[in-house]
A protein has these predicted regions:
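Long, well-ordered hydrophobic secondary-structure segments characteristic of membrane-embedded
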Residues: 28-59
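N-terminal, positively charged regions that mediate nucleic acid binding
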Residues: 1-38, 140
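Cofactor-binding beta-sheet edge motifs in enzyme active sites
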Residues: 3-5, 9, 26, 41-47, ...
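Conserved mixed alpha/beta catalytic, RNA-binding, or beta-rich assembly cores of soluble enzyme
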Residues: 60, 220, 227-260
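ATP/Mg2+-dependent ligation/transfer catalytic cores
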Residues: 8, 12-17, 29-31, 57-66, ...
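A generic structural motif
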Residues: 12, 57-64, 129-134, 182-187, ...
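Glycine-rich, mobile lid/loop segments that gate access to catalytic sites or pores
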Residues: 4, 8, 43-51, 71-223
């Protein structure tokens, strides 16, 4: 039976959105460990140089103002984007803080004098297998390992940018590996292909087919190339597509949100 799993880099626009939401959460809990946080981030290229919107609910005790949000966003972008484009410019994009106070109904349901309650009902799925050292499903584990190695290469190679995806298919005579990685215009694709093939051999046993950037050139990436939104990569964040997910995202949520 064929099995396919995909992973994405921290420079993928959806994962950048996740990172910003988690940075807001971390700052809120650092300011006050009792902060209640449910943050969503949206980022996109625009005709005026890019937009990042941070919204959701947050306790007043978290004490994060507009300047705090701006710093958080810029810190996250500095770790996940190398290159500015006309429609997403790191030095001039618009950052919009739309955080509002947490609902009093949710607050009263979560907290009382004796117990800590859940902020919502939900479905949570746990999984482990002894087929891999990570206890993850084998195909997903393979994709994830290749992605982590690719991320290191992306950070250390000046000809590569930071948006990428890795897809692995197993179950046939040969494993199929597809990598899409953002790059500079003047990159030598043939040389990159050789380097990535060498890397893949460390994580794939036996023969494999390898496709690099099957859609062609991939210069414009990150939020300049595609919109990013918190919570759109929940399968990647969990155990891959062979294991059910409950449906809730992890990022930007304090521990009273049971899916976190």
């Amino acid at each position: 039976m064929y099995k396919t799993a995909e992973t994405v880099s921290p420079g993928h626009p959806d994962k950048i959105a996740d990172l910003i939401s988690d940075y807001v959460l971390t700052e809120a809990l650092s300011n006050n460990s009792k902060s209640r946080v449910a943050v969503e981030t949206f980022l996109t290229g625009t005709t005026y140089g890019g937009l990042v919107v941070v919204g959701g609910e947050i306790s007043d005790i978290a004490k994060i103002d507009d300047k705090g949000i701006e710093k958080i966003v810029k810190d996250a972008l500095a770790k996940t984007i190398k290159t500015s484009f006309e429609d997403f410019q790191l030095d001039s994009l618009k950052i919009q803080n739309e955080l509002t106070p947490q609902s009093e109904e949710i607050r009263s349901a979560v907290e009382d004098d004796e117990d800590l309650g859940a902020g919502d009902q939900g479905i949570m799925v746990g999984y482990a297998t002894n087929e891999t050292e990570s206890f993850m499903p084998p195909t997903f584990d393979m994709s994830r390992n290749i992605q982590m190695a690719l991320w290191e290469i992306q950070n250390n190679d000046e000809k590569l940018d930071l948006d990428s995806k890795v897809q692995v298919t197993t179950g046939g005579e040969e494993t199929k590996v597809v990598i899409s990685t953002q790059h500079k215009k003047d990159i030598d694709i043939d040389e990159l292909r050789i380097n990535l093939e060498d890397m893949i051999t460390k994580y794939v046993d036996g023969k494999f087919q390898f496709d690099l950037n099957p859609s062609g050139s991939f210069v414009k990436g990150g939020p300049a190339g595609d919109t990013g939104l918190t919570g759109r990569k929940i399968v990647v964040d969990a155990y891959g597509p062979t294991v059910p997910v409950g449906g809730g995202a992890f990022s930007g949520k304090d521990p009273s949100k049971v899916d976190r």
